């Protein structure tokens, strides 16, 4: 079946997100895994690693969306595949919102209370925060999947064509729409509010401290801007569809396009990784060099780069006031 122009646009967007997001997140994954394996990793690196895993989960499920768009949003796979891919896809989105909030809290505490934070922080705190984000997203999305699985695929029209998560009876909407509203409030507006407050204070401190260099200030502003774009551009339209749907008592017609914007998060997060960690900046630099010189071996130099990156992180962090943080003021 040849996709129409609307499906073709969405198909193109999904393919571009997949092609740009997958290699960038794999590079970031390699960098964060090597960093977390070192003794006493910083909580922020644990959170960034989990954010990378959430992005990769979304990207690995994106081919199902690509196939669906190529089929004019007709679902030809088994019913359970629709339920499981939807569960994983939306869980990764909502896990990302709270992980972003956790990263913003870590950044704010690191610059507002550098000495106290350096003395009190533990890797366990990052693990606990990441687990809470995953449990909250999986738990909430499980509720939606249980409701939607009763109608995860439905016959539409007169040609026995099947769609995935698009058609619901009014009785099902009476359950689904309030749950979506709760998702929007708890897993979007609350973490976005926390993130905006933390980055507002974070950027203000970085810009008003006279001993903070211009490069660190630019990275601080870039980190805040990319995170804000994530919430407003990527997650915003999809969650606004929850509010509009609850008001109209039906899913809005533009919900499919909103889901595409939420997928864009997987391509935007690598920019956040770039501003957040010198390990990732070096990994991206090495990756660009490898693209220019295909004959060189990334794997062959992986261990050497990891050791070098770890030493640089530690040295730079100790100078700035806390291990493994690019933004801790003295």
Swiss-Prot record:
Subcellular location: Cell membrane
Top-level taxon: Eukaryota
CDD domains per UniProt: 7tmA_FFAR2_FFAR3
Keywords assigned by UniProt, alphabetized: Cell membrane, G-protein coupled receptor, Glycoprotein, Immunity, Inflammatory response, Lipid-binding, Membrane, Receptor, Transducer, Transmembrane, Transmembrane helix
Chain residue ranges for the region called Disordered: 300-330
Tissue expression per record: Detected in whole wall and separated mucosa in the distal ileum and colon. Expressed by enteroendocrine cells expressing peptide YY (PYY) (at protein level).
Gene3D superfamilies: Rhodopsin 7-helix transmembrane proteins
Positions annotated with a glycan in the UniProt record: 151, 167
GO cellular component, one term: plasma membrane
GO molecular function annotation: G protein-coupled receptor activity; lipid binding
Membrane topology of the entry: Multi-pass membrane protein
Biased composition (Polar residues): 315-330
Assembly and interaction partners: Interacts with FCN1 (via Fibrinogen C-terminal domain).
Protein name as annotated: Free fatty acid receptor 2
Species this protein is from: Rattus norvegicus (Rat)
High-level lineage: Eukaryota, Metazoa, Chordata, Craniata, Vertebrata
């Amino acid at each position: 079946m040849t996709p129409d122009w609307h499906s073709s646009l969405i198909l193109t967007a999904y393919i571009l997100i997949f092609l740009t997001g997958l290699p960038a997140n794999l590079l970031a994954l390699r960098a964060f895994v090597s960093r977390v394996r070192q003794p006493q990793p910083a909580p922020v690196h644990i959170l960034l690693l989990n954010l990378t895993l959430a992005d990769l989960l979304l990207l690995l499920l994106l081919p199902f969306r690509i196939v669906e768009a190529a089929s004019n949003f007709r679902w030809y796979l088994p019913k359970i595949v629709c339920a499981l891919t939807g569960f994983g896809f939306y869980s990764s989105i909502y896990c990302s919102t709270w992980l972003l909030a956790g990263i913003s809290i870590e950044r704010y505490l690191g610059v507002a209370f550098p000495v106290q934070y350096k003395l009190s922080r533990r890797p366990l705190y990052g693990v606990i925060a990441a687990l809470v984000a995953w449990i909250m997203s999986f738990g909430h999305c499980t509720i939606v999947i249980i409701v939607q699985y009763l109608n995860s695929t439905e016959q539409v029209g007169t040609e026995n064509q099947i769609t995935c998560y698009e058609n619901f009876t009014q009785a099902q909407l009476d359950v689904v729409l309030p749950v979506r509203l709760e998702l929007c409030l708890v897993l979007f507006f609350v973490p976005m509010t926390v993130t905006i407050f933390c980055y507002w204070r974070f950027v203000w401190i970085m810009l008003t401290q006279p001993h903070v260099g211009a490069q660190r200030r630019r990275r601080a502003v870039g980190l805040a801007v990319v995170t804000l774009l994530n919430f407003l551009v990527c997650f915003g339209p999809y969650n606004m569809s929850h509010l509009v749907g609850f008001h109209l008592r039906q899913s809005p017609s533009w919900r499919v396009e909103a889901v595409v914007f939420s997928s864009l998060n997987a391509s935007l997060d690598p920019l956040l990784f770039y501003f957040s960690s010198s390990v990732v900046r070096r990994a991206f630099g090495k990756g660009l060099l490898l693209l220019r010189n295909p004959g060189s071996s990334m794997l062959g130099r992986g261990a050497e780069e990891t050791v070098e990156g770890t030493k640089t992180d530690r040295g730079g962090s100790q100078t700035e006031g806390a291990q493994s943080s690019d933004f801790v003021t003295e």
